[in-house]
Structures are given as structure tokens and as C-alpha cells.
Design a protein with these regions (language model features):
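Membrane-proximal helix-turn-helix segments that form the acceptor-binding/catalytic region
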Residues: 186-193
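ATP-dependent carboxylate-amine ligase catalytic core
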Residues: 9, 26-28, 32-48, 73-160, ...
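Inter-motif core of Ras-like GTPase G domains
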Residues: 159-169
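Charged, amphipathic alpha-helical linker segments immediately N-terminal to NTP-binding catalytic cores
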Residues: 11-26
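A conserved segment at the C-terminal end of the G1
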Residues: 54, 62-79
Length: 193
């Protein structure tokens, strides 16, 4: 990864993904300060299209995928951001069902790496969320469907002003971050509204 700081170096997909996974050392940091600063440095890409924001304990990924498919069938150009990936990183970011190209992952990783210097240390999820928001803007999507990663109120995806929100079923999950009762967890997830 040190090579990425050498003049003339062009990041490859494999080095980009390796860099991204090293960001997991930052763990989970709930809060919007880093994500807000990062999107400002990117020029607020999330304001270039409409968003549908989906939170919940179970079924949010399926709900997001179905919503994206319905919007695409209606003739919209649709971005879809989900997590986690099952096989490869690029599954997380799609436009009209097509995974983000490897070359774009490398370009955006390099771009974000430069924008984070010297004072931002985003988590893996913040970084990939910013990458998705920028890719959707650059791809000219009409609408982006965003699946919340954890909770909602302080999730990295909550830098958008959605045209609509959905909250799927609520159950006890991530209690160390969201609270120990269904009402407290529902409060956190409803934070996207």
C-alpha cells in the first residue's frame, strides 16, 4: 500500500481492495462527522440524484434489491448499495444491476485516499459508502437505493436526504451499539426518517 504514495503510481483493483480491507482496523464508529466531511470534500455527490433509504433488522437487503429492480423496470437508471458482499467486493455497488467495474474501484479508492489526507480516517464502511455515492453521481443515476449498514441514525448512509425511507422488521441485533430493547433499536433505525 505504500506504493500508492509514489509519484506516477496507479492503483490496481487488487491493491484497492487490499487497502479497503485494511481499513477494518478502524472498526465501527457510529457518527456522521467523518462521512459528512468526506462527502463535502467530494462535492456532495448524494445531492445529484434521489435516494430511497432502507433500514431494519431483517430483510433490508432483499427489500433494497426488489426496490431497485422495480425502479429499473419502470425505466429509471438505478444505483444499489448493499452490504455485506457475498463473494466479491464489487457486489456492494451496482448501477442497473451491473457491479462497479474494477477500474472504478481502483480510481475511487485512490481519489478518496487523497481526499482523506491529512485528517480523515474513515472506517471501511464509511469509505465504501462514499465510494458508492460518488459512483452513482458519476454514473448519472436517477435514483439510488441505499441499505443501512448498522442502525440508521448514525450510519454512514445517513448523509442523504431521501425521497422515501423504509424500515423493515425490527428485532434485537447489535445491542452493544443500538440498545437492548426493541423500542431503543427501532428509535435508532427510525433515525433515517
Amino acid at each position: 500500500w505504500l506504493a500508492s504514495f509514489l509519484p506516477g503510481y496507479t492503483m490496481t483493483y487488487s491493491s484497492a481492495v487490499a487497502y479497503l480491507f485494511r481499513l477494518q482496523k478502524h472498526g465501527i464508529k457510529l457518527g456522521l462527522a467523518t462521512m459528512t466531511a468526506l462527502t463535502v470534500r467530494l462535492g456532495m455527490p448524494q445531492t445529484k440524484y434521489r435516494t430511497l433509504h432502507i433500514a431494519g433488522t431483517n430483510g433490508k437487503g432483499s427489500t433494497a434489491a426488489m426496490a431497485a429492480a422495480l425502479l429499473q423496470a419502470a425505466g429509471y437508471r438505478v444505483g444499489l448499495y448493499t452490504s455485506p458482499h457475498l463473494v466479491e467486493f464489487r457486489e456492494r455497488i451496482r448501477v442497473n444491476g451491473e457491479m462497479i467495474p474494477e477500474s472504478r474501484v481502483a480510481q475511487l479508492t485512490e481519489q478518496l485516499q487523497a481526499l482523506c489526507q491529512p485528517d480523515l480516517s474513515p472506517t471501511f464502511f464509511e469509505y465504501t459508502t462514499a465510494m458508492a455515492l460518488q459512483h452513482f453521481a458519476d454514473s448519472g443515476v436517477d435514483v439510488a437505493v441505499l441499505e443501512v449498514g448498522l442502525g440508521g441514525r448514525f450510519d454512514a448512509t445517513n448523509v442523504v436526504t431521501p425521497m422515501a425511507c423504509a424500515v423493515t422488521t425490527i428485532a434485537l441485533d447489535h445491542q452493544e451499539y443500538l440498545g437492548t430493547t426493541c423500542p431503543s433499536i427501532a428509535f435508532e433505525k427510525a433515525g433515517i426518517i
